[in-house]
């Protein structure tokens, strides 16, 4: 679903790809076609996951308007750490040598060099640090897992367990190698004298909570899966710095078009971040809206301080990814509890906070075409155990956990 949001600029329940296995809609002009119509050469390398043609080759009509193609629909099933199989414009299999992210970086640099004389829009979709599905592992390049074994563990993962101890070293190793590869891409742009006229955007479609929040590793409302890195380099973003405004993946498509001087269509749901960098334009929203799927049908809003989430009960009628009723499931005070260890949703003293956040959520739901009932939390909360005060204290926290007395 996140991939469809990026290619259309619309929330998943509007563009229709609200879960895996639903192809990218053809009723919305995709991002690549906006760039193509503006005179850009468009290319895609890596994982697509927006077609129904199986794991490998993707038919031309299902490629979202990209002209040049070297990709697989579900890359984790056509490759592993030292074997990378992608498919070209003719749907012929192409094997790339080296560690997987290195092989894709090499392909990206070749593409940049081949098209350096014309404006281009290249979308590279790495799979690292996604886990390797069929072996339930995070295969770092040789030596990298060992380098990052027994390193720092985020407090939420340390408290909640999951598969963290088994997988975190490999995950860190994959992140490190990918970071080195991105450095090679920026070096290539500099050597080709393209760095001052090229914008590089780095982001992820989701994070990873290592099975601490539910039986999976990414499908939840928690920061470890919901919050992702987002960095811009070059052009109006060359000055450096960090901004703290709340933004969403839905803001990236209008930003890319805006920076390229291409009109942003009204059909896109996000806002260009260029105004934030240039400190112009209207006030920025004080919250972001998000949707969760597959492990649950959920909706939520996040402000600077609060996280509020609802999900459809198991017996709800879910049609086209939407429910007629949701139950309040999580409320977190991110200021007092940044690692989301104390769920406040059922505590009466936070009723006013819930009410205000519920109002924001209902406005967002109306925008995407939902008018559900939001019910109070059920008597028993599932999906996350309560963490004892002693466990939190052992992690080095000295503050009281909100909503609990000692």
Regions inferred by a protein language model and the residue ranges of each:
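Residues forming the ATP-binding cleft of Hanks-type serine/threonine protein kinase domains
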Residues: 335
């Amino acid at each position: 679903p996140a991939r469809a949001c990026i290619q259309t600029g619309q929330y998943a329940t509007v563009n229709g790809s609200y879960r895996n296995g639903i192809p990218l809609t053809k009723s919305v002009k995709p991002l690549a076609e906006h760039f193509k119509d503006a005179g850009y050469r468009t290319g895609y390398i890596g994982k697509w996951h927006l077609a129904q043609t199986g794991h490998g080759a993707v038919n031309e009509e299902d490629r979202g308007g990209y002209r040049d193609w070297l990709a697989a629909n579900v890359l984790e099933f056509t490759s592993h750490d030292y074997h990378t199989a992608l498919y070209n414009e003719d749907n012929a299999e192409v094997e790339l040598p080296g560690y997987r992210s290195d092989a894709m970086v090499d392909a990206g640099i070749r593409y940049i060099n081949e098209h350096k004389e014309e404006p281009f829009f290249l979308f590279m979709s790495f799979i690292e640090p996604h886990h390797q599905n069929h072996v339930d592992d995070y295969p770092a390049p040789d030596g990298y897992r060992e380098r990052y074994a027994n390193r720092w563990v985020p407090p939420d993962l340390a408290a909640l367990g999951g598969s963290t101890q088994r997988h975190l070293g490999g995950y860190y190793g994959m992140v490190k190698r990918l970071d080195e590869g991105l450095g090679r891409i920026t070096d290539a742009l500099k050597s080709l004298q393209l760095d001052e006229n090229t914008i590089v955007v780095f982001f992820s479609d989701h994070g990873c909570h290592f099975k601490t929040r539910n039986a999976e590793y990414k499908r939840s409302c928690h920061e470890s899966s919901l919050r992702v890195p987002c960095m811009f380099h070059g052009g109006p973003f060359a000055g450096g710095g960090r901004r703290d405004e709340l933004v969403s993946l839905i803001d990236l498509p209008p930003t890319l078009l805006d920076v390229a001087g291409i009109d942003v269509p009204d059909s896109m749901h996000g806002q260009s971040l260029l105004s934030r960098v240039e400190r112009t334009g209207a006030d920025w929203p004080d919250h972001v809206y998000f949707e969760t799927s597959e492990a649950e049908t959920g909706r939520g809003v996040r402000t600077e301080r609060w996280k509020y989430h609802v999900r459809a009960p198991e017996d709800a009628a879910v049609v086209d990814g939407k429910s007629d009723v949701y139950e309040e499931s999580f409320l977190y005070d991110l200021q007092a509890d940044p690692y989301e260890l104390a769920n406040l949703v059922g505590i009466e003293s936070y009723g006013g906070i819930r009410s205000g956040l519920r109002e924001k959520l209902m406005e967002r739901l109306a925008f995407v075409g939902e008018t559900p009932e939001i019910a109070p939390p059920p008597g028993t909360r599932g999906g996350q155990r309560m963490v004892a005060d002693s466990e939190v204290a052992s992690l080095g926290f000295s503050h009281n956990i909100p909503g609990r007395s000692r």
